[in-house]
């Protein structure tokens, strides 16, 4: 696209796969979100090739974590697709293995967690997926998150900024604020210049995120364990892999408790704020309660009169 300004990283080009995890300059992107939200199709759009199996249906076809590579004008890019591990019903005996393998594929840690959600369809399941991402990767993960909306074509004449700004979905508004208003949209059926433009927008956000994080990637104790296992060669030492999965279980449980403590602390602060407001504005609060009860009584009487 001639009028499109290139980012620092340039444009995606196809090429042979490489183990770019070993390269210090490798950009690691981890796809997260609920099942069937379009993670695999988004990965294919980023790489501009059918690297991940993707079907147009509401159920996930990704059963295990999968890593594929591409380049962005000389810089290697690793894209990791994930199985259904970010939802409450995903708790099963293979959960530890799925999470552990995901850590191994994007060790020493992702620069970007790309939360994929369908435009206009941010549901309670999506909100649960966000919470599960925090449980799996730690409460600090939002610092490295970008929200990517699929079905960009549904915007029609409306801009994405307008959609996000005027949405009445409180959970979505809270999410975009929490991740620093880093979001973009993809039409995963796009090709040519349209696809190129989408990629340029995403990479501009990636560049902004890396500047904000001073080039750092998301890491925690479990990523350190994953790196140690990779150095040992876990394919040969199965006992080391079993010990690693035990650490996965322990660390995820620890991160879950930390998240609950953080949420509990926030609720406690809100209660203290309400109490403070009540004690200093007792008369005003009492008046609001009386007015509320009056309006409720009037509404009930109106409903009764209409039913007669």
From Swiss-Prot:
Keywords: Endosome, GTP-binding, Lysosome, Membrane, Nucleotide-binding, Transmembrane, Transmembrane helix. Residues 1-283 are cytoplasmic. GO terms for molecular function: GTP binding. It is a single-pass type IV membrane protein. Pfam families: AIG1. One of its GO terms (cellular component) is lysosomal membrane. GTP binds at residues 33-41, 54, 151-153, 188. Disruption phenotype: Knockout mice are born at the expected Mendelian rate, with a normal sex ratio, but have a median survival of only 15 weeks. They exhibit chronic hepatic hematopoiesis and, in later stages, show pronounced hepatocyte apoptosis, leading to lethal liver failure. Loss of GIMAP5 function impairs peripheral T-cell survival, imposes a complete block of natural killer (NK) and NK T-cell development. Mutant mice show progressive multilineage failure of bone marrow and hematopoiesis. The chain crosses the membrane at residues 284-304. Expressed in thymus (in thymocytes), spleen (in splenocytes), lymph node and lung. Highly expressed in T lymphocytes. Expressed in B cells and in distinct lineages of hematopoietic bone marrow cells, including natural killer, B, T, myeloid and erythroid lineages. Expressed in liver endothelial cells. Residues 24-227 form the AIG1-type G domain. It is found in: Lysosome; Lysosome membrane; Endosome, Multivesicular body membrane; Endosome membrane. Residues 305-308 are mitochondrial intermembrane. Plays a role in T lymphocyte development and the optimal generation of CD4/CD8 double-positive thymocytes. Inhibitor of GSK3A. May act by sequestering GSK3A in cytoplasmic vesicles and impairing its translocation to the nucleus. Consequently, impairs GSK3A-dependent transcriptional program and regulation of the DNA damage response occurring during T cells proliferation. Required for the survival of bone marrow hematopoietic stem cells, as well as of peripheral T cells, natural killer (NK) and NK T-cell development and the maintenance of normal liver function. Belongs to the TRAFAC class TrmE-Era-EngA-EngB-Septin-like GTPase superfamily. AIG1/Toc34/Toc159-like paraseptin GTPase family. IAN subfamily. Interacts with BAD, BAK1, BAX, BCL2, BCL2L1/Bcl-xL and BCL2L11/BimEL. The interaction with BAX is increased, when cells initiate apoptosis upon IL2 withdrawal. Forms a complex with BCL2L1 or MCL1 and HSPA8/HSC70; the interaction between HSPA8 and BCL2L1 or MCL1 is impaired in the absence of GIMAP5. May interact (via N-terminus) with microtubules. PANTHER family: GTPASE IMAP FAMILY MEMBER 5 (PTHR10903:SF69), GTPASE, IMAP FAMILY MEMBER-RELATED (PTHR10903). This is GTPase IMAP family member 5. The lineage of its organism: Eukaryota, Metazoa, Chordata, Craniata, Vertebrata.
């Amino acid at each position: 696209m001639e009028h499109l300004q290139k980012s620092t990283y340039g444009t995606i080009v196809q090429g042979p796969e490489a183990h770019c995890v070993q390269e210090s300059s490798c950009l690691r992107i981890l796809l997260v979100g609920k099942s069937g939200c379009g993670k695999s199709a988004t990965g294919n759009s980023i790489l501009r090739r059918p690297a991940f199996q993707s079907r147009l249906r509401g159920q996930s076809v990704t059963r295990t974590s999968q890593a594929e590579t591409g380049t962005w004008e000389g810089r290697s890019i690793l894209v990791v697709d994930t199985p259904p591990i970010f939802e409450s019903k995903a708790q099963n005996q293979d959960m530890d293995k799925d999470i552990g393998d995901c850590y191994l594929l994007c060790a020493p840690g992702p620069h970007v967690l790309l939360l994929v959600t369908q435009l206009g369809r941010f549901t309670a399941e999506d909100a649960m997926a966000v919470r599960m991402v925090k449980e799996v990767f730690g409460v600090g993960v939002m610092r490295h998150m970008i929200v990517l909306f699929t079905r960009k074509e549904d915007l029609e004449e409306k801009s994405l900024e307008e959609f996000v700004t005027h949405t009445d979905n409180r959970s979505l508004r809270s999410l975009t604020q929490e991740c620093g208003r880093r979001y973009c949209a993809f039409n995963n059926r796009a090709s040519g210049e349209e696809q190129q433009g989408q990629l340029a927008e995403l990479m501009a956000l990636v560049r902004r995120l890396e500047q904000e994080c001073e080039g750092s990637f998301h890491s925690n104790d479990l990523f350190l364990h994953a790196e140690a296992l990779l150095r040992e060669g876990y394919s040969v030492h199965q006992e080391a892999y079993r010990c690693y999965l035990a650490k996965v279980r322990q660390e995820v449980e620890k991160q879950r408790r930390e998240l609950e403590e953080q949420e509990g602390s926030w609720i406690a602060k809100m209660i203290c704020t309400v109490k403070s407001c009540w004690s200093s504005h007792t008369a005003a609060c009492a008046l609001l309660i009386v007015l509320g009860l009056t309006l409720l009584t009037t509404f009930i009487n109106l409903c009764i009169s209409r039913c007669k």
